[in-house]
Curated annotation (Swiss-Prot):
Residue stretches spanning the membrane: none
Keywords, ordered alphabetically: Host-virus interaction, Inhibition of host innate immune response by virus, Suppressor of RNA silencing, Viral immunoevasion
InterPro entries, per database record: Gemini_C4 (IPR002488)
GO BP terms in the entry: symbiont-mediated suppression of host innate immune response
Purpose: Pathogenicity determinant. May act as a suppressor of RNA-mediated gene silencing, also known as post-transcriptional gene silencing (PTGS), a mechanism of plant viral defense that limits the accumulation of viral RNAs.
Record bears the keyword Transmembrane: no
A Pfam cross-reference name: Gemini_C4
UniProt name for this protein: Protein AC4
Organism: African cassava mosaic virus (isolate West Kenyan 844)
Entry similarity comment: Belongs to the geminiviridae protein AC4/C4 family.
Length: 183
C-alpha cells in the first residue's frame, strides 16, 4: 500500500501538513480531539534505526497507534518522533479498540522513532516500578528441604533482571501491539 501525504484530521478541520509543521498541527488537533491515532510513515528502512513500533531490517507499512493526549504530553521523545517521520493523526471513535489499546499503551516502553543503533533511547512511563529492587525471602526448615543457596538466589535475581532488558521489552511490546491491531 503506497504511503499517502500526511494529514491532520480533527472534528473541525483537516489540514495538510506540508505547509505547517507537524508539531503545530498536533497542537491544533490536541485542542479538539480526545484521542489521536498516529500513523507513522518513516522515510527509511529500520535497518538503520530502532523503534518499538516496527521490527528491525524491514520496510514499514502503514501503522496506526492509539495514544491519549495525557500519554503524549508525558513523553519527551514525541516531538523528536514527529520530526523524524511523517505521521497522520485523527480522532478515534471506536470505544472498544480505544479501551483495549489504552491499557496496552500505558505499559509500553517507548523509544524515539529514530535513534542510533549504538545508543538507543528508551522512555519508560513509570521508571519507579521497574527500578525497584528484587528481594527473595526463603525459609530454611530444620530438615533442609526447599533450601536455596546464595548462588541460587543470585541466579534468580539475575534472571529476573535479564527479563527487563530494553531489547526484550521492545520485542514483547511490538508483538502485543501487532496482535491487538490485527484483531
Amino acid at each position: 500500500m503506497p504511503f499517502r501525504d500526511t494529514y491532520i484530521m480533527s472534528p473541525i478541520n483537516r489540514r495538510r501538513c506540508s505547509r505547517v509543521s507537524l508539531v503545530e498541527c498536533l497542537q491544533l488537533t490536541w485542542s479538539t480531539x480526545e484521542l489521536l491515532v498516529f500513523e507513522f510513515k518513516p522515510r527509511m528502512s529500520f535497518s538503520h534505526t530502532q523503534s518499538v513500533l516496527y521490527p528491525k531490517n524491514t520496510y514499514c507499512h502503514s501503522f496506526k497507534h492509539f495514544l491519549s493526549n495525557q500519554t503524549l504530553s508525558s513523553l519527551k521523545s514525541v516531538e523528536s518522533c514527529i520530526r523524524m517521520g511523517n505521521l497522520t493523526c485523527m480522532p478515534s471513535f471506536n470505544s472498544r479498540v480505544k479501551s483495549r489499546l489504552r491499557t496496552i499503551v500505558s505499559s509500553i516502553v517507548y523509544t524515539q522513532a529514530v535513534a542510533p543503533v549504538s545508543t538507543p533511547t528508551f522512555k519508560v512511563p513509570n521508571q519507579a516500578r521497574m527500578s525497584s529492587p528484587i528481594w527473595i525471602r526463603t525459609a530454611t526448615p530444620s530438615n533442609g528441604d526447599n533450601f536455596k543457596s546464595m548462588d541460587d538466589l543470585l541466579e534468580a535475581v539475575n534472571n529476573q533482571r535479564m527479563m527487563l532488558t530494553p531489547k526484550r521489552l521492545t520485542a514483547a511490546v511490538s508483538q502485543k501491539l501487532l496482535m491487538s491491531l490485527g484483531n
